[in-house]
Amino acid sequence: MKLRKYTILTLFLFLFGALYLNGCASSRPEPATPYDGTDYIRESELLPYDLADYETIPTNPNGSLSVPTYITRLDDQYFIVDCYHNQVIYHDNLTDPLYLWKVMTNDLSMGHTIASDGNVYLIDDTENNRILIMEKMQNSSGEIVYVPTQEFTGIGNRPHYIIYDDYTDTFYAWSSQSGEMFLFRHTNDSTRMYLTKVLSIPELDGVYVRSFTILDDRIYFVSGNSNIIEADLYTFEVLNRYPVPDAIAGMIQLEKIQNYYYITVSTDLTGNQDFATLIRVKNLKDLAKGNYEDVYANFLGGGTPYSLTRIDDRYYLTEHRLPGHSIWSFRVENDEITDVEAVY
């Protein structure tokens, strides 16, 4: 009888353990299936265009950048969002002078970021509460051109940050002052974009939050109200709040690099840019105690660091307020910042 009880108990523990482990291993839903175009809030508004208007591509009229807010590489081209010049520019290398770059679009009012899935390019037109959609085409000379083909108007209050997440096959566009996230998708056989869902963090309505970061099945919102918020990516249920000191409350971006969270800070809680810096911390809980490392001296300091992006094995930091230093490049090896270079 005892042997039978032990056998049943052992079997129960084995099955419970297997279920528990399987549950933990599959806590995140499977990668998104292709979108079928049937379930959506609204579809994009189509923009008229004539390829004949793109026989000549304008070059960048500016010899310097004015508050560059984002740099990335999409396909074989580098793109810079030149925010205060109201344009996105592109080029095939980072060594040529800026006046050789070409203008992708200047139909923006203070755009901040650009994202692509290889088929469409989405840009947040911040002050117009608009998402601009562009597509890559060829003009009659066979030259690659970028053409505005669609748009979404009335997108929240100052959409400020947009990314494409391959796992969920979704573009996420954050409305920086309404606490809303707008999700966009398209079908495999068409570039027509659909607004498929709007999620929100109600406590961030009316709070200026500049960006977010997706890490697996979690999404992190940088501090706009003295807290970094961690939420479930799929439901936006708030899971954790990480208080931060007033001196670093006006954050811009959070990026996980090896064992540290790197965070760019624009202002303190009162909006004073004299507190602008770049910090890093291993555990977000340590921020409340002031246990973080200021690493801005690696980039001279004195400006306002903005966005962090990764291209191949290097990271890129944009900044402003420091003449002659708008974009930096660096590596991180064994948690050490190395090979720092001024790009533009």
Question: Which residue ranges define each predicted feature?
Answer:
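A short helix->beta-strand "capping" segment at the edge of beta-propeller domains
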Residues: P31-S66
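Beta-strand-rich domains and repeat architectures in extracellular enzymes and scaffolds
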Residues: E55-N86
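Surface loop/turn motifs at the tips and blade-to-blade linkers of beta-strand repeat domains
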Residues: T59-S64, K102-D107, Q150-G156, V198-D205, ...
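Repeated scaffold domains used in trafficking and secretory/extracellular systems
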Residues: S66-Y70, S109-A115, G156-Y164, D205-L215, ...
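Conserved beta-strand positions in repeat-built beta-propeller and related beta-rich domains
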Residues: I80-Y84, I123-E127, D166, Y172-Q177, ...
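Structural motif
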Residues: Q87-Y90, N129-E135, S178-R185, N225-D232, ...
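Loop/turn-rich, solvent-exposed surfaces of beta-rich toroidal or solenoidal domains
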Residues: D246-Y292, Y306
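Blade-level signature of beta-propeller repeat domains, shared across WD40, Kelch, NHL, RCC1
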Residues: G302-Y344
